């Protein structure tokens, strides 16, 4: 009997917050608030499983194009999330990491990101990663520049060492909520052999129960990694 696949790194594109709110006659920001609650539910579910890394697409390099009022709200929401969740992370042995080009964020937000990163550094359970001002193409360019500056040979192995996610294994399973069928410039290098799952469920409505069903399907799939 074939062994079930091992899921160590789960990545999620959390899509559908705005549409969730609009369908209910609410402002888009209300969808982001509800989406933050879903982050908490999914993170706690993963922390109680064998998953080692959960990487969430929280804010892309393209999201700056949204209305300033929405971007400002997202920054405040992120700040509130980092402060409110700190105790939860530590209590549940969850390590926090952030990836992306963080230089565009305010010094206050950077301090909050660094504070939670340092406080949770010794946690040995799930590592929750927020992709912030993240774009995969941008990440690969930055990694290549670092390789050149370090004077090392440009190779697949070396590039992986200089990516934002150098601390984590490649993605095993990638889920996108919201009904669209695209990767949106997310973890393109790391997801080369990831199993992809797309669901019409909007992120605020996504549950640990639905994720559990997808994980069972993942475990049954045959991962060939280019072989037969």
Curated annotation (Swiss-Prot):
Gene Ontology CC annotations of this record: cytosol
Gene Ontology biological process terms in this record: polyprenol biosynthetic process
Residues that coordinate or bind Mg(2+): 15, 195
Residues at the catalytic site: 15, 63 (proton acceptor)
Highest taxon, organism lineage: Bacteria
Keywords for the protein's UniProt record, in alphabetical order: Magnesium, Metal-binding, Transferase
Binding residues for substrate: 16-20, 28, 32, 60-62, 64, 66, 176, 182-184
E.C. numbers: 2.5.1.-
Classification via InterPro entries: UPP_synth-like, UPP_synth-like_CS, UPP_synth-like_sf
Cofactor note: Binds 2 magnesium ions per subunit.
Molecular function per GO: ditrans,polycis-undecaprenyl-diphosphate synthase [(2E,6E)-farnesyl-diphosphate specific] activity; magnesium ion binding
Swiss-Prot/TrEMBL cofactor(s): Mg(2+)
Assembly notes: Homodimer.
HAMAP family, per database record: ISPT
Family indicated by similarity: Belongs to the UPP synthase family.
Function as written in the Swiss-Prot or TrEMBL entry: Catalyzes the condensation of isopentenyl diphosphate (IPP) with allylic pyrophosphates generating different type of terpenoids.
Protein name in the entry: Isoprenyl transferase
Species annotation: Wolinella succinogenes (strain ATCC 29543 / DSM 1740 / CCUG 13145 / JCM 31913 / LMG 7466 / NCTC 11488 / FDC 602W) (Vibrio succinogenes)
Name of encoding gene: uppS
